Amino acid sequence: MELSIQKIEALIRLSTIVMLVLTACLIGLDSQTKVIFYVQKKASFKDLRALVGLLYITSLAAAYNLLQLCCSSFSASYKGTSLQSYAYLAWLRYILDQAVVYAVFAGNLAALEHSFLVLTGEENFQWLKWCNKYTRFCTQIGGSLLCGFVASLLMFSIASISAFNLFRQYSPTKFMHLKL
């Protein structure tokens, strides 16, 4: 069962990396130029600060998951003897997995809110609707947000597996004692 959980976690991490890289590429390569009244106007992800933040967050999350994938493949070939050190590493992985899930989900929500304002506009602040002029730009941002939320769900499952791997090391009868 141990090996199958590791394989499932590796497969989910690989899928997460693909979705995060796809999100970052869709955001980073998105721009559209239109001629409006003989003036060229360009819409880019750099115009929306939440998208710039999401680009950085998804890139760092993909790098973190790649690092964890490499570490887990290395640890699968090397079995440590100290159960105590493995517990510390399991705690570290659990906390980092939780932090990355929350960061990516929060970044996606911030970008979604900013994109919603771009979609609908806001008369009180004199913000114009962009999506009636830059349709391809808005469609591509919508696709990147969808990929980002799928990556968040995948990372939630990784965090659940990480929690399972952590708490199965402890005794069910003695509070916070490792199994021997």
UniProtKB/Swiss-Prot annotation:
It is found in: Cell membrane. Its main location: membrane. Pfam families: CASP_dom. Residues 29-49, 120-140 are extracellular. Residues 1-7, 71-98, 162-180 are cytoplasmic. The chain crosses the membrane at residues 8-28, 50-70, 99-119, 141-161. InterPro entries: CASP/CASPL (IPR006459), CASP_dom (IPR006702). Keywords: Cell membrane, Membrane, Transmembrane, Transmembrane helix. GO terms for cellular component: plasma membrane. It is a multi-pass membrane protein. Homodimer and heterodimers. PANTHER family: CASP-LIKE PROTEIN 2C1-RELATED, CASP-LIKE PROTEIN 4A4. Belongs to the Casparian strip membrane proteins (CASP) family. This is CASP-like protein XL3.
